[in-house]
Structures are given as C-alpha cells and as structure tokens.
From Swiss-Prot:
Gene3D superfamilies: YggU-like. The lineage of its organism: Bacteria, Bacillati, Cyanobacteriota, Cyanophyceae, Acaryochloridales. GO terms for cellular component: cytoplasm. It comes from Thermosynechococcus vestitus (strain NIES-2133 / IAM M-273 / BP-1). Belongs to the UPF0235 family. This is UPF0235 protein tsr1994.
Amino acid sequence: MGKKHVIVKPNARQASVSITPAGQLLVTVRAPASDGQANQELIALLAAYFGVPKSRIQLVKGHTSRHKVIELLD
C-alpha cells in the first residue's frame, strides 16, 4: 500500500487519527513516549484506522522521533 508520513503526539487525553492540511497523518496517543509504548499504541490505532492487522504495519523510520514513516505491507 505504500509509505505514510506520521506525526505522533504522546500523552494525549484522547487517542485519535486525523489528516493535516499537508496530507500527513496526525496521531494522538494516550501512551507515554517511553519504552516503545507510544509506538505500540500508534501501530494499533493505525491498524484499526486502515482496517488491516497490526502485522501489516511496519515502522520504517523515526523510532524515537515524533515524525515517523510507516509502511503498509501488502
């Protein structure tokens, strides 16, 4: 399906997925940005958003950054 640029905001009150005017995904997660907790919640939210299993979403770049690149595998 391709690569997507994602901006993640951890420690949010409510988890959500939206699209910025620039076409990037803006994902707010409730989990803190420590020990990969926010990344795990990010993958779960994106899997639900795109309607695919979590195993088909791969974090390509930005493991410790708020700006990430994910890939949706076929």
